[in-house]
Amino acid sequence: MISCNILGITIAAFITSTLAAYSSNGVNVMYYWGQNSAGGSNTQGSLVSYCQSGQVDVIILSFLNKFNMGGLPEINLASACEQTFFPNTNLLHCPTVGSDIKTCQSNGVKVLLSLGGAAGSYGFSSDSEGQTFAETIWNLFGGGTSDTRPFDDAVIDGIDLDIEGGSSTGYAAFVTALRSKGHFLIGAAPQCPFPDAILGSVIDAVGLDFVNVQFYNNVCSVASGSSFNFDVWNDWAKNKSPNKNIKVMLTVPGSSTAAGSGYASIAELGPIVSSVISQYSSFGGVSVWDASQAWNNNGFHSELYSIVHGSSAALGQAARKTPFPNTSSITTTSLATASSALFPLLYAGRSCSSQSKVSCTSTGSYTICNYGKWVTAPCPPGVICLSSAQSNNTDLTVSAQFFITSFAGGSFKAIINARRTTLTPFEKMKTIEFTVPDHVRLSQCNLGKIEQVGRSVRIRLKDHPNMAFVLNLSGNVSSDAFVAPDPSSWRFS
């Protein structure tokens, strides 16, 4: 009896391990790996340990975070590869990772390299720089040759553009040039508000294989109810993307500590995956930030793999080809009370000209300009529409978004999602200044100190130099309505 049980477990484990393999036509489960965002000394396993788990189809090495145009780029894999630089360079030599890449590929798991990330310094000043960098990437990581290949003779399967900051200049030229070198999987990781502030024009210009849409740290997160906007991305994939067969990945946090907001437990995520896969033929699976978080989250990784592949198998290809319905749950960009005198009802179907513009209706719903027509949708349960609760500020150097994640009993929680729009990253010490209404009082933030005198707020942050950051705030409102900070008052220094 004991022998039978052991044999059964062994066979089950073998079957599971053989199931994990990348599918070009079906769904996949992708994990970002390398940064050990869980933060513990033993929270991140080796690359090969994930590839042999039977619960990963694609691994994304994170990150190549410094382009260093005119020289060699830099990679950062946290504790997975440290202080082993090629002589007289800042480029890591990681032979163990290289060996693991080849083992992963022999098991059918694709290995990609992510360019960018929140921390680093990257971007192009021209298309020619993008084309030159494509040659660099091909020689260092692809099928080219170089004396300074970080992973030796291992050849990655593609790249992921996780461009959190900078400008869009040069990326379309980079992708086009890299495509000309040979077969590479190429994707991008835009944030879910549509269109993405930096990658929007890039993904409209060149055909990609997938987009890892970040459905977290934004109002359109997977956990936001009717604000979740996968339908908008499906619409883009089918009607505007140069590659009409592009896969839209549902990118989520691997645990509650993996992101500032937007985490959905596996119990919550299961029905969402089943719903998305049944409605949208562009659905390509689930991507997770990151492996260290998911593997330390009470079986999240194993249940997720079963959910994604189980939903796909149960549904079958015929059901997956069902046309997606008319948009009814478009992303909202704000949460605040509405006055019909100030925010008149914008009737669904009427013409509009400002893509993605959002306003509240007099009934407490919200309406968004979607491809020339106003579309109205209800707010999530327990939430009312606040037309001024998000402020968007774009100056010459920063694009910032302020939105409310909860508002009840006079208390609120909010997020500032800031992205650099130049090639120079934010410095280690940062200051944010803005003006709030008289009845709003900020009390806490996760990265620094809040100083408020009357309506004037100053937040001093101490963080790593980075291209983007997410700041969690909380405070109180002595009013029944929340009004956002004045967009014209935002200052970043």
Swiss-Prot record:
<dbReference type="InterPro" id="IPR001579">
    <property type="entry name" value="Glyco_hydro_18_chit_AS"/>
</dbReference>
<protein>
    <recommendedName>
        <fullName>Chitinase 1</fullName>
        <ecNumber>3.2.1.14</ecNumber>
    </recommendedName>
</protein>
<dbReference type="InterPro" id="IPR050542">
    <property type="entry name" value="Glycosyl_Hydrlase18_Chitinase"/>
</dbReference>
<dbReference type="GO" id="GO:0005576">
    <property type="term" value="C:extracellular region"/>
</dbReference>
<dbReference type="InterPro" id="IPR005089">
    <property type="entry name" value="CBM19"/>
</dbReference>
<dbReference type="GO" id="GO:0008843">
    <property type="term" value="F:endochitinase activity"/>
</dbReference>
<keyword id="KW-0732">Signal</keyword>
<dbReference type="InterPro" id="IPR045321">
    <property type="entry name" value="Cts1-like"/>
</dbReference>
<dbReference type="InterPro" id="IPR001223">
    <property type="entry name" value="Glyco_hydro18_cat"/>
</dbReference>
<keyword id="KW-0146">Chitin degradation</keyword>
<dbReference type="GO" id="GO:0000272">
    <property type="term" value="P:polysaccharide catabolic process"/>
</dbReference>
<keyword id="KW-0378">Hydrolase</keyword>
<keyword id="KW-0624">Polysaccharide degradation</keyword>
<feature type="domain" description="GH18">
    <location>
        <begin position="27"/>
        <end position="318"/>
    </location>
</feature>
<dbReference type="Pfam" id="PF03427">
    <property type="entry name" value="CBM_19"/>
</dbReference>
<comment type="similarity">
    <text>Belongs to the glycosyl hydrolase 18 family. Chitinase class III subfamily.</text>
</comment>
<keyword id="KW-0119">Carbohydrate metabolism</keyword>
<dbReference type="Pfam" id="PF00704">
    <property type="entry name" value="Glyco_hydro_18"/>
</dbReference>
<dbReference type="InterPro" id="IPR017853">
    <property type="entry name" value="Glycoside_hydrolase_SF"/>
</dbReference>
<dbReference type="GO" id="GO:0008061">
    <property type="term" value="F:chitin binding"/>
</dbReference>
<feature type="signal peptide">
    <location>
        <begin position="1"/>
        <end position="20"/>
    </location>
</feature>
<keyword id="KW-0326">Glycosidase</keyword>
<dbReference type="GO" id="GO:0006032">
    <property type="term" value="P:chitin catabolic process"/>
</dbReference>
<feature type="active site" description="Proton donor">
    <location>
        <position position="164"/>
    </location>
</feature>
